[in-house]
Swiss-Prot record:
It is found in: Cytoplasm. Mg(2+) binds at S231, T252. It comes from Wolbachia pipientis subsp. Culex pipiens (strain wPip). This is tRNA modification GTPase MnmE. Its EC number is 3.6.-.-. It is an enzyme of class 3 (hydrolase). The gene is mnmE. (6S)-5-formyl-5,6,7,8-tetrahydrofolate binds at R24, E82, K120, K442. GO terms for cellular component: cytoplasm.
Amino acid sequence: MTNTNETIFALSTVFGKSGVAVIRISGNYTLKALNHFHIKKKIKPRFATLVDLYDDSNQLIDNGIIIYFPAPNSFTGEDVIELQVHGSKAVIKIILEKLSKIFVMARPGEFSLRAFLNGKFDLTQIEGIADLIDAETKMQAKQAIKQISGELERLYSNWRQRLITIQSKIEAYIDFPEDIWAEKSELEKINNEVQSLVQLIQEHLNDNRRGERLREGLHIVITGEPNVGKSTLFNFLAKRDIAIVSEYAGTTRDILEAHIDIGGYPIILSDTAGIRESSDPIESEGISRAKKRSFEADLRIELFPFEQRHNINCNVVNSDTIYVLSKADDAINDRNILIGGVDFLPISILKGIGTNKLISLIKKKAEEKFGHDRDTPVITRQRHRSHMQKALEHLQRFKIDNPIELISEDLRLAAFELGAVIGIINVEEILDSVFSSFCVGK
């Protein structure tokens, strides 16, 4: 764990050429930086002040903006300075080297860790900050903002407090059994409250991994026979040439991936080898991987040649599959074609037929998977899910006629697991796991 007595610093922006670079300092001795750079101006808290920065030989390093946030009203809860200088590699190096003589370089996530330890955020809010930094699409950012606002913290704190209240009643029986436990109505209230929490947590867990999927991206696989236009469609959706497009069958053997944004939703798109019987061991391995990836995918786009539409025999219909008639250059329009009771969408990348409709259909499927119409808090990480599952298991063991000590212990352990999600309990392994994923300077 970190030594919070040390004053830390780090570059909070990307190292490289830029208009502005931001360097953050936090700790009890933050204001020493003013003398270290020979800053003579009076710095007013929470106001931007233009200053000149000098080295020890009184040579000007750069001029920039300094903002001072006194404790406890800062991001970390400590004295914080944010120094904005020109995004020059040389300037950044000089300033960081000079700061290293009096302060300690922050570890990844150490500023956020101090914010957590000083009660500025709970663990789920801290994770929300990390998710916002990593967000690549509008919907990912929206989910992260909701988490930063404390949506999960309020939910889990409420459930935990309800458990603590129940446990206090159980503990009271241990000390005064004749006053409480004899009341049958009280027993029923306790049992009903526990069962209510069991139902709420079960519903929370049975969310089809919506939050985790949104963080990670929806996996979509383009599948079909060789030379049916998979790579052409892949490149079109990716908006760049990644896959080799060839008239020869079997060109794609390895699985190719592209991270794309459709309607604000993150999509991990895969182009796979054409499915067919092959005596070539390398192609056969590619086909085997294609089948495995297709099976594991959240959604499939299965391509059939438009010119062979009258010979299509679609034996297995899957609601997680979009059926497409590819190379439909001769199609009159993009109206779905019904084949064997299944809707097929004709598309032509060459003529732009059906492409917008396909994108709209992918967006609709993504909305269904992510549950865009639901406004309830969602689990966003496996860490949350593991603790919630353990809490549920403890509550499911609850039986009102169990030994009183066993009842109390199950309630205590369930509350412990809920506390572990938001960081009320101080488990070093949990904190190290959460903050190690942050970048330096955050």
